[in-house]
Amino acid sequence: MAFVPPQAGYDRAITVFSPDGRLFQVNYAREAVKRGATAVGVKCGEGVVLAVEKRITSRLIEPDSYEKIFQIDDHIAAASSGIIADARVLVNRARLEAQIYRLTYGEPAPVSVIVKKICDLKQMHTQYGGVRPFGAALLMAGINDRPELYETDPSGAYFAWKAVAIGSGRNTAMAIFEEKYRDDMNLEDAIKLALMALAKTMENPSADNIEVAVITVKDKKFRKLTRDEIEKYLSEVLKEVEEEEVKEKEEDYSELDSNY
């Protein structure tokens, strides 16, 4: 008789809790996000920034066709990590909900309303048979009265953040945000902080494998940065990172000298 692990029944069933209160399929969906490319978001008084790593696996792929930041409405955007096909379904649903709200009420949808709609859909996929959880997390950003930034989890939970990261580089990026985030940052500072957090999680950061979008308080319009703009900000950030690393090495050497 083949050995069956004790958790196997809970492992296969999406709607059954394990004895210790877990839904294994939801945990596995979170693992898919942890393996995904890093995406970061930073909020400031002038607007909100989204930046993502584009993992282009072949030089034959057209970089512009590999989209990781999506426009939901004029004033709302989303960045994804995890299974990109799952993220696309969620993005299309968010776009639909935003248009339904606009047609029904004659005004742009609040960011929080669209986030809740998407997370309601995610939660449904943890509760019913015949479906599986979405293996994707979204960072959703937008502006109604003020800048807003949310993280959505495969379980259907969502949280508002000042700065946040998802994907394989989450821990590294969050450590940088904890150290360097300031409430009085302007939009340029927020872009540089997002790029710094992203660059620290990547082997060879460049304008070709990074995508950045902003929504400003001034016009409440979604806009992707051009390659030249990304290159300009990234060169400044990489120079700053290099200077910090040199300074850290000098401090380490001086500490060693003082011990002799």
From Swiss-Prot:
Activity regulation information from UniProt: The formation of the proteasomal ATPase PAN-20S proteasome complex, via the docking of the C-termini of PAN into the intersubunit pockets in the alpha-rings, triggers opening of the gate for substrate entry. Interconversion between the open-gate and close-gate conformations leads to a dynamic regulation of the 20S proteasome proteolysis activity.
Keyword field: Cytoplasm, Proteasome
Annotated family: Belongs to the peptidase T1A family.
Subunit structure: The 20S proteasome core is composed of 14 alpha and 14 beta subunits that assemble into four stacked heptameric rings, resulting in a barrel-shaped structure. The two inner rings, each composed of seven catalytic beta subunits, are sandwiched by two outer rings, each composed of seven alpha subunits. The catalytic chamber with the active sites is on the inside of the barrel. Has a gated structure, the ends of the cylinder being occluded by the N-termini of the alpha-subunits. Is capped at one or both ends by the proteasome regulatory ATPase, PAN.
HAMAP family per the UniProt record, alphabetical: Proteasome_A_A
Principal subcellular localization: cytoplasm
Protein name as annotated: Proteasome subunit alpha
GO cellular component, one term: cytoplasm
The species this protein was found in: Pyrococcus furiosus (strain ATCC 43587 / DSM 3638 / JCM 8422 / Vc1)
Function: Component of the proteasome core, a large protease complex with broad specificity involved in protein degradation.
Subcellular location: Cytoplasm
GO BP annotation list: proteasomal protein catabolic process; ubiquitin-dependent protein catabolic process
One MF annotation (Gene Ontology) recorded for this entry: threonine-type endopeptidase activity
CDD domains noted in UniProt: proteasome_alpha_archeal
